[in-house]
């Protein structure tokens, strides 16, 4: 018989109970459901991490022989459980003079053999890519400006990614007036960075991922309110997700061809900053009247999307961006908004989101919205001043910069990244 439990988690569910086994050993019972998904296992692991951390426990051994028959059928149970612990253990404390020690030693005994440390498993590369994304998003704007960001991406060459950085001189030569216009008020440079992973030697079209990388967004002369402006370091989260994805693919030696493209800028106020009413010429040749300098992300993505399509001729393009506050009004922080011109791609993205509990909701695209973005002075304007459909008109704007209609395009517009702090486990992909 087990001794009387000395502690349990405060939750009514009582997922964990600790028993004293000996002066230096304790047994922890973990409650699980009958038919747990991989995400359920990760959530259990995340909750377990919080539990053992609060009880100051740092060394664990999982015994495969003690796993219930229900869970032993899932051969990945322990790996998924520990992955949830690892995701939840993330902490950005780089700039704290006193750091809380959170290291935990986790072992596993398979078939009563010697304990094996869980270090390199099938989730290791995913964890590295995820944490790299989180590190990028967490850096303050004075540290991770476009110049520094481009340098950090270049470091990924050592894991096999083919990387090219286009600086302002290159972008001017290419004619990327939309992207350059956003960054012209900053003393920092503006860049377009491409990352290629060729894991499949066939000549299959690559999968393309494009990310918005506004390292800090003041709103420009369409200035944002002072309150919460510090959160605008998160306006590069879409690009960070793309960079983390490309790192994961390279570490996994994934058998696919993929390309990641990110536009890196700072949207600042200065004597050289873009003015409301300016007209810029995009890489596509289409002109844009900039009525609002705080609708800048779509200008960065416009050039990045056209460039990605023309240069890489991908099977599809998915862009990730913290593009509009309007999507939060529509969906809150539980769902990311999905806009797509391809039903099959949409179904795949929605299904993937459900599986990892990072849910997407498909929003409408329709040619009737185009008239809201038409300009009297240019081919289009960058904002809808009529009111309403803010996220849809932003996506409709971006769709104009896909030249060939055969390219499937998906836009994932995410809520404020700060919302991830309340998640049961920290998300693996930040939108």
Regions found by a protein language model. Give the residues of each.
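Short amphipathic alpha-helical segment within the helicase RecA-like ATPase core
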Residues: 1-213
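Helix-centric, low-specificity signal for extended rod-like, repetitive segments
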Residues: 81, 418-421
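A generic structural signal for tightly packed, nonpolar segments enriched in small/aliphatic residues
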Residues: 133, 150-412, 419, 431
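Compositionally biased, low-complexity intrinsically disordered regions
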Residues: 415, 424-425
């Amino acid at each position: 018989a087990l001794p009387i439990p000395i502690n349990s988690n405060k939750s009514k569910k009582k997922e964990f109970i600790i028993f004293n086994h000996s002066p230096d050993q304790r047994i922890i019972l973990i409650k699980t459901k009958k038919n747990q998904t991989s995400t359920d296992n990760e959530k259990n692991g995340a909750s377990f991490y919080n539990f053992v951390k609060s009880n100051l426990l740092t060394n664990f051994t999982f015994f495969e022989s003690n796993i219930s028959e229900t869970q032993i059928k899932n051969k990945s149970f322990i790996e998924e459980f520990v992955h949830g612990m690892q995701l939840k253990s993330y902490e950005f404390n780089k700039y704290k003079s006193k750091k809380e020690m959170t290291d935990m030693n986790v072992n596993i005994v398979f078939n009563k053999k010697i304990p094996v440390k869980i270090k390199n498993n099938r989730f290791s590369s995913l964890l590295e890519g995820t944490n790299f994304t989180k590190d990028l998003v967490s850096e303050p704007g004075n540290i991770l400006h476009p110049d520094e960001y481009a340098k950090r991406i270049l470091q990924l060459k050592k894991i096999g990614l083919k990387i090219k950085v286009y600086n302002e001189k290159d972008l001017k030569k290419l004619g990327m007036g939309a992207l350059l216009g956003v960054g012209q008020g900053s003393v920092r440079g503006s860049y377009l960075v491409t990352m290629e992973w060729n894991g499949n030697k066939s000549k299959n079209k690559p999968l393309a991922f494009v990310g918005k990388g506004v390292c800090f967004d003041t709103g420009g002369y369409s200035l944002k309110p002072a309150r919460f402006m510090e959160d605008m370091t998160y306006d590069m989260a879409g690009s960070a997700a793309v960079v983390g994805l490309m790192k994961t693919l390279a570490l996994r030696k994934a058998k696919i061809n993929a390309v990641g493209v990110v536009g890196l800028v700072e949207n600042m106020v200065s004597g050289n900053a873009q003015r409301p009413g300016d007209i810029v010429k995009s890489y596509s040749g289409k002109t844009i009247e900039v009525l609002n300098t705080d609708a800048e992300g779509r200008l960065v993505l416009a050039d990045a999307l056209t460039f990605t399509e023309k240069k890489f001729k991908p099977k599809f393009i998915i862009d990730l961006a913290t593009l509009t506050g309007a999507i939060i009004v529509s969906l809150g922080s539980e769902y990311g908004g999905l806009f797509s011109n391809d039903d099959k791609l949409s179904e795949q993205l929605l299904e993937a989101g459900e599986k990892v509990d990072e849910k997407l909701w498909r929003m409408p695209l329709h040619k009737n919205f185009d008239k809201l973005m038409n300009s009297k002075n240019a081919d289009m304007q960058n904002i809808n001043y009529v009111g309403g459909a803010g996220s849809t008109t932003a996506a409709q704007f971006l769709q104009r910069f896909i030249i060939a209609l055969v390219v499937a395009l998906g836009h994932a517009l995410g809520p404020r990244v700060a919302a991830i702090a309340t998640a049961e486990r920290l998300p693996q992909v930040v939108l």
